[in-house]
Amino acid sequence: MSASSGTGHKRGHNPLIGLDIDRLEAEMGRYHNWLDEHADEAYIVAEQARKLGFDHKEFVEIPRAADLAGRTEKLLIEYLEGYEVADDIRKLLAEHDRETTSIMMAQSVARGFRERGYDLITAIDVGLRVGLAVLTEAVLVAPLEGISEVRLLNNVDGSQFVSVHFAGPIRAAGGTAQALAVLIADMIRRELNIGHYQPTD
């Protein structure tokens, strides 16, 4: 057997040769549209069934979303209370990476909640959850159950600092996201002009 017909020849083989790529992509697009349409129909049936009152809740708990921005908004719907974040997330993601977007959105939401008259703790809490949701692509439970409490405590000199309490589900986010959650909280407190923690002897 010659060298050209050995392993090296197989390694250079292109499996797409002879395939009609345009036709396959069109078929894939039609298939995705079919999935979307039938998923929508299934959700309509499920909503109607839930309204009969035989289940614990009268609505389907898992909302559908097309992208990270939509997932974030729907995941945190109970915390956002009508505050819309999806469009802002999309704009920021078009210009920045996910980590930068998570920090910028966290600050923006916290500031927006303060402007709407919410207290500091609520503003920090919701901002942190939005930032963590963007960071974890809104597919983990961490933004919901990984943050158990946000508190404002006092330093020895009387100034306030932010204290974030995490729960077990934060582990699903992974070590990097856990560390960045602390950074996000710190960036929020800077945005809202809250003091930093002052360690003592």
Predicted regions span which residues?
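Extended, Lys/Arg-rich, non-catalytic nucleic-acid recognition/anchoring regions
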Residues: 1-201
